[in-house]
Structure formats: structure tokens, C-alpha cells
Amino acid sequence: MKKYNDMKRKVFIAVMSLVVSGGLSGQSVYPGQHSGKLKKETIAPMQVKSFDLKDVRLLPSRFRENMMRDSMWMASIEVDRLLHSFRTNAGVFAGREGGYMTVKKLGGWESLDCELRGHTTGHLLSAYGLMYAATGSELFKHKGDSLVSGLAEVQNALGNGYLSAYPEELINRNIRGTSVWAPWYTLHKLGLIDQYLYSDNQKALEVVIRMADWAYHKLKPLDETTRQKMIRNEFGGVNESFYNLYAITGDERHRWLAQFFYHNEVIDPLK
């Protein structure tokens, strides 16, 4: 039993390392990557540029062993489990045979009483894109495509471009300045941009642009006092997501959204 627990602990550490590194490299757009997909390139002089994951393969090594171990875990997760809280929020289970009760639920942060639900799905959506780029395995392409299709279905059911595993009321609570657990941070981690950049999923880009349209119409009418009150709540790096989307689309509304999340109280004292 001890040996089994030690093995589980090692796998958990390895998986979390992938998730953390995927969050760093997958959520950012580095100069030199994603040729042909960016309308706004970096104009600052760069001495070193990054490379695309698809252009590199790991040779037999501890790193490759860990990557393949992680890939086995990622491959084992059922897409329906990752979508269950999103589908529940949109009410789409009503049209499915067996409905909600047929899905084996995720717990912890993904439980339906947790305001961070949807977080794990987003991290894995990024990870599937990264793993597909790093290995070329169509399995991870299929996993990512299936998740994106499921999320698009949820977005269509919700109707206004909003997409999440929790009700829009959590965003409204954030805007009012009342207690809520990081709804913008969870949207930041959703991973749709990564699916477009790393897996060439055009539908993922369409879904995230609709989300940005919703966010723009939601936030544009807010005054400065309301904005400052709203961003006192943890919002992660959602501004980075909007800047990355702006780099892809060139749409000035996406840059406006990124600038909207400029946190004066934190950044200004550092000047």
C-alpha cells in the first residue's frame, strides 16, 4: 500500500508540474511562436526568440518518461466528466438520454457547490493543446476538439456569448463588489486560445471571440469606481488572455478589455 501511495504521489507531482508549466507557456504568446496566426507581432527588439513545440521532440530521457506518464493520465479522463458542470449550468442535460445522473462527477474544485468549477477543464484544455503540439498524437487533438465542441454547445445554449461552469450571476456579484471566488480567473484559464494556437482549432477561436464580445458589452458601461471595486477580487491573468486575443485578431475591443483589468492599486506603486 505504501509503495502504491508513493507512486500516486509521484504521478500527482509530475502531473501538477505539467499543469503549472502548461499554464505558464500555454497561456502566453512568445515572439517566434505561432507564425501566421498573429496580426499583432512583437515590435520590441528581441535577441532570443522562442520555437514552436511542434518543431521539437524529446529524446529518450527522464523528461520524456515523465511526459508520457502524464499523457497516459490525460488520455484516461473522460470528456463528459470535464463538461458536466458546464452542461449543468446551461441546462443541456435535459435533452440527453439518462441526463445528469449518467455522468461520473468530478469533485473538489469541480464540485457544483464550488465557485471555481470549470478551472480543471480549462487547465486540461490547454494541456491537450500543448501535448498535441509536443507529441503529434491525434488522441490529444481529438480530446481537445471534443471539449471545444462541448463548450460551444454550452455557449449556444446560454445564448449571449457567456461561457462558464457557473452562472453569470457570479460575474454580477464581482461587479457589485460582493463576495465571490475569482470568476474572471477561471475564465482566464479556460484554454480556448491555446486550442487555437497549438491545435489549430478554429472553432475554439470563434468561441473565445464570442466570449470577448460578451465581456466587452458587460464591462464597457462600468464607471471607474465600479471597475476598481471589481478588480480587487482575484482575476488571475485575464488581461493577458485579452492581450493574446488582441494579438490574434487585431480587434481594438480586445485590447480595451486587457487594459480594463489594469490593477492600479498593485501596479502604480511599482512605477
Explain the meaning of each model-derived region:
Residues 27-271:
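Glycan-recognition and catalytic cores of secretory/periplasmic carbohydrate-active enzymes
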Residues 1-31:
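Bacterial Sec-dependent N-terminal signal peptides
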